[in-house]
């Protein structure tokens, strides 16, 4: 009868078990955050590229943001903590907080999410400037590449 002898199979099985155990928290988490960072950087550059004005309409719709609005968007933009939704690991990019423009209606300052939505989607008095949509679409391939590199790097660490 023939006899087969495998060397290193126990080590390989151990590595696969470690990979499975580290997948959710380590590999997937670092991969998702790597892609989110690339997209977040693109959105930050898009916010910095928004034209600045005094916030008053001249001959039509407002097409600018004020300096406090722009600063509020930059300060309030961020990445949420990772969330597990039925096995799908997600992070969200978004705006939080208030800017320094205080009004009677907004005594704490204008909500950054309100300004971001009105600039991105437009209103009856503001021209549409799709800065978030353009940034997300333009950074999609770079985000996928960053995620692929991060995933490979994390798997390589475990499989050594």
List PLM regions with ranges:
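Charged, low-complexity interaction tracts
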Residues: 2-3, 41, 45-160
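N-terminal, Lys/Arg- and Ser/Thr-rich interaction peptides
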Residues: 1-25
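Charged, well-structured alpha/beta interaction segments
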Residues: 20-53
């Amino acid at each position: 009868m023939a006899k087969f002898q495998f060397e290193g199979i126990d080590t390989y099985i151990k590595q696969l078990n470690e990979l499975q155990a580290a997948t959710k928290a380590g590999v997937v988490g670092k991969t998702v955050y790597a892609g989110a960072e690339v997209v977040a950087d693109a959105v930050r550059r898009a916010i910095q590229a928004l034209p600045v004005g005094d916030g008053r309409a001249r001959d039509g719709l407002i097409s600018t943001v004020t300096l406090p609005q722009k600063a509020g968007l930059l300060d309030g933009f961020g990445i949420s903590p990772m969330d597990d939704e039925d096995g799908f690991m997600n992070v969200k990019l978004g705006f939080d907080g208030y800017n320094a423009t205080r009004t009677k209606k907004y005594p704490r300052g204008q909500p950054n999410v309100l300004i971001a939505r009105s600039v991105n989607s437009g209103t009856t008095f503001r021209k549409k400037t799709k800065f978030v949509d353009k940034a997300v679409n333009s950074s999609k391939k770079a985000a996928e590449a960053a995620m692929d590199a991060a995933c490979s790097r994390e798997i390589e660490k475990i499989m050594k």
